[in-house]
């Protein structure tokens, strides 16, 4: 199987294609990307027949910015008979996947696919039963086995394949299903909530998002991101010239600092988190984030980079390379991840976790 399907935000197919071509090439897995504008997915076709599986095994999914999900597939199944779509799909998967741990019948995230998604939901139950009978799926769901994907691009037309549970998105279609809290000051709160789900393993939440931590929110008004930190019982310094929502101030956990986020300097030495969603040029935001991390002013940060209209992948790559270079130059070991989240628009979200430094900061992990 030499094709890899990558799901992405509609309108960002070129960025997704540029990224997978670049990162696959660096691992000497060569091929070309098939791109259809606003399709919500890209197909990377490897030149060597077994390189599809090699790519989804060797390249960490967490290193991809513009892909929401990926899986290796075979040839396109077309003209599935309406009276029996199941038999051809089972036939395609037999001998390819054995004892898969989960089935996902998916579509691209486009308006055109909404009707198709209704069919996928109904189709999943009988297909799952047939795949279990054929030995393609285990009799129970397990995260220890590959995930079987059936990806419909049109009625009666699908790709079939699989991904590895340890190197994919755990979410259906790569999208966490989050509900907007009615008491949140703005919808931007969902960006930070999704980022926490994507970047921080669930079993580490109690330690890394603990009660009583101190956090800073730069460019906080009206408080969408502060809301998430308050909900996790943190003490938050919200920095913005604009006012904060009164509901947040009433919690007693928020200190509003009427300052410019770029000029603010923390006066505590025990800040665990700094978050930032300011509308500013990516280079300026990245330089500020580097300053915070190099100086050890926080242990972890999540921030957004607003994207230009053109050369978006190149712009993000350039800024992440600058950030890495600054950390390296100052002897800071950190883990950097970036992703265009479902709730992001013309932007990407970056997470950096400072692990240790040659010159000790106050929030280093030893």
Curated annotation (Swiss-Prot):
It holds the Pfam family RLMM_N. The active site is at residue 306. One of its GO terms (molecular function) is S-adenosylmethionine-dependent methyltransferase activity. The keyword S-adenosyl-L-methionine applies. Transmembrane segments: none annotated. It catalyses: cytidine(2498) in 23S rRNA + S-adenosyl-L-methionine = 2'-O-methylcytidine(2498) in 23S rRNA + S-adenosyl-L-homocysteine + H(+). GO terms for cellular component: cytoplasm. S-adenosyl-L-methionine binds at residues 188, 221-224, 240, 260, 277. It is found in: Cytoplasm. The keyword rRNA processing applies. It comes from the Bacteria. Its EC number is 2.1.1.186. Keywords: Cytoplasm, Methyltransferase, rRNA processing, S-adenosyl-L-methionine, Transferase. GO terms for biological process: methylation; rRNA processing. InterPro entries: RlmM_FDX (IPR040739), RlmM_THUMP-like (IPR048646), RNA_MeTrfase_FtsJ_dom (IPR002877), rRNA_MeTrfase_M (IPR011224), SAM-dependent_MTases_sf (IPR029063). Monomer. Belongs to the class I-like SAM-binding methyltransferase superfamily. RNA methyltransferase RlmE family. RlmM subfamily. Catalyzes the 2'-O-methylation at nucleotide C2498 in 23S rRNA. This is Ribosomal RNA large subunit methyltransferase M.
């Amino acid at each position: 199987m030499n094709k890899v399907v990558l799901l992405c935000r509609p309108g960002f197919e070129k960025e997704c294609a540029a990224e997978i071509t670049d990162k696959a090439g660096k691992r000497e897995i060569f091929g070309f990307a098939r791109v259809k504008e606003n399709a919500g997915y890209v197909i990377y076709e490897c030149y060597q027949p077994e390189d599809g599986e090699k790519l989804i095994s060797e390249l960490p999914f967490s290193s991809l910015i513009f892909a929401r999900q990926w899986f290796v597939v075979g040839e396109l199944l077309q003209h599935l008979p309406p009276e029996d779509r199941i038999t051809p799909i089972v036939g395609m998967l037999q001998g390819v996947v054995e004892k898969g741990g989960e089935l996902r019948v998916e579509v691209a995230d486009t308006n055109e696919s909404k009707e198709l998604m209704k069919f996928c939901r109904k189709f999943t139950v009988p297909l799952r039963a047939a795949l279990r009978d054929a030995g393609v799926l285990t009799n129970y769901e397990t995260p220890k086995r590959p995930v079987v994907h059936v990806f419909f691009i049109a009625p009666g037309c699908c790709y079939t394949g699989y991904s590895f549970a340890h190197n994919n998105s755990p979410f259906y279609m790569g999208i966490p299903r989050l509900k907007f809290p009615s008491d949140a000051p703005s919808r931007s709160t969902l960006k930070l909530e999704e980022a926490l789900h994507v970047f921080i393993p669930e079993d580490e939440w109690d330690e890394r998002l603990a009660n009583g931590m101190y956090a800073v929110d730069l460019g906080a008004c009206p408080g969408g991101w502060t809301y998430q930190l308050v909900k996790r019982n943190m003490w938050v310094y919200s920095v913005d010239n604009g006012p904060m929502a009164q509901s947040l101030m009433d919690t007693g956990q928020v200190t509003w600092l009427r300052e410019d986020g770029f000029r603010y300097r923390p006066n505590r030495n025990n800040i665990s988190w700094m978050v930032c969603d300011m509308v500013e040029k990516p280079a300026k935001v990245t330089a500020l984030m580097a300053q915070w991390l190099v100086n050890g002013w926080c242990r972890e940060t999540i921030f957004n980079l607003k994207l230009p209209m053109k050369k978006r992948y190149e712009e993000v790559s350039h800024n992440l390379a600058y950030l890495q270079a600054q950390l390296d130059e100052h002897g800071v070991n950190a883990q950097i991840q970036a992703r265009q989240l479902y709730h992001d628009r013309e932007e990407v979200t970056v997470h950096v976790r400072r692990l240790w430094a040659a010159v000790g900061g106050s929030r280093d992990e030893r």
